[in-house]
Amino acid sequence: MTHQDTTQQRADWVEAAVPAEHTDEHDAGYPAHAAPGTEHTGREQLVLERIERARRARPRVREKLITLAHGAGGKATQSLIEAVFLDAFRNPALEPLEDAAAVTAGDTRLAFTTDSYVVSPLFFPGGNIGDLAVNGTVNDLAVSGARPVHLSTGFILEEGFPVEDLRRIVASMAAAAKAAGVSIVTGDTKVVQRGKGDGCYINTAGVGLVTGELNLGVATARPGDAVIVSGPVGDHGITIMLERGELDLEAELVSDTAPVH
């Protein structure tokens, strides 16, 4: 396949993926007298410009009802965040949409994050919703260049949830917090009617200290930067899917939930 063929295929694919409604139709044409051999280069440039205009376009949520896709972390989630939450709450700390917000208290630089955990099953090989809730929030702080210090936790429990299961979850949270060097300093508990929840949901928020001039985040990534991976990719997700019976295979995997710092 020639370079020209590859360029043509890429242009065709992107034109199909980016709706024309995101473009200014008056500048979407080709030069009337393009030099021989430059037609595809010109077309690719126009497609790239169309992509950039689409990125700058005001995000929209086309669905009338919330779907599971809106919580799956993909394109639907991003559209929901930008079109609903960011549009309403917009401020300089929120706009970067990083794992943690960069804020200050006097001369102290802080990272602040929150996350909610609705994993099912609650207990899985290698951990449970409790240590996952601690490690997930601690890691959002760590990858933002902060030293995690304090966490809050909120529980939404379903009527009829076994107290012994709650004790196991809380004990695992305490152990994970100790291992990560953080303190759980405040919390909240609510109980919903039987059938109105899935046993136990947990929210954790965390605060960490950022020292020096360190400034980590997606916005600072540049070509050539190293990507550091703390272990095998996907162990936790596949472990959960196996426990749910969603994969037609057998494997002895355990979740790798752990603090990365």
Describe these PLM feature segments.
Residues 2-261:
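Helix-biased detector of long, well-ordered alpha-helical tracts
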